């Protein structure tokens, strides 16, 4: 299930009732500010979905409309460009990763997409903390081009959460000592049955 609203979370009268009725082994949740200059609507609201993949992005590509978007559009297969409904840098990053997923596994698709972004952006900055899931695994990055990426934390068995739960979050949600800062240029791979995998990007 995917639930999106383009309104501030505190104005969403349905959220409390909805949240109390949800039960799952894996959740992705995002609360984001709108990007100045881009339309506010469902089409620009995360998480984005393609088939069984969900995608979220914390960051930006500077001057995306002038630099990133035209270059990414030259690369994308028609199938993935046609699936784009909004105009955010986030949705184009997702499409670029999906483009490379056609011939790679997800880890390699992320590496390939970030490598291409490094090439096409030149001296422009980009903050690329992304999270993807197919319902079985979560892939999360802390990464930046010509900048310092937003924070990312991993926590296991954190007080106040379900026993044996694992969390990947942008900000530590408590003063617990169980939170670990994820280093810059890292990819985390989390699954239900395996140990957390951390790879350098």
Where are the regions a protein language model picked out?
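Conserved short alpha-helical segments that host acidic/polar catalytic motifs at enzyme active sites
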Residues: 1-54, 62-201
């Amino acid at each position: 299930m995917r639930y999106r609203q383009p309104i501030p979370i505190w104005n969403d009268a349905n959220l409390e009732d909805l949240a109390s009725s949800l039960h799952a082994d894996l959740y992705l949740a995002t609360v984001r500010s709108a990007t100045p200059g881009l339309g506010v609507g469902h089409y620009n609201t995360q998480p984005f979905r393609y088939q069984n993949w969900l995608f979220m992005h914390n960051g930006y590509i500077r001057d995306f409309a002038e630099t990133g978007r035209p270059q990414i559009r030259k690369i994308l297969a028609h199938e993935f460009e046609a699936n784009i409904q909004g105009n955010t840098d986030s949705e184009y990053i997702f499409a670029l990763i999906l483009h490379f997923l056609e011939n790679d596994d997800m880890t390699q698709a992320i590496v390939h997409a970030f490598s291409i972004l490094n090439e096409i952006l030149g001296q422009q900055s980009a903050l690329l903390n992304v999270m993807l899931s197919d319902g079985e695994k979560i892939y999360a990055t802390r990464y930046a081009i010509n900048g310092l990426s937003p924070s990312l934390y991993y926590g296991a068995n954190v007080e106040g959460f379900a026993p044996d739960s694992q969390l990947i979050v942008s900000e530590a949600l408590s003063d617990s000592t169980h939170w670990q800062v994820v280093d810059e240029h890292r990819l985390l791979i989390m699954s239900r049955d395996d140990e957390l995998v951390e790879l350098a990007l």
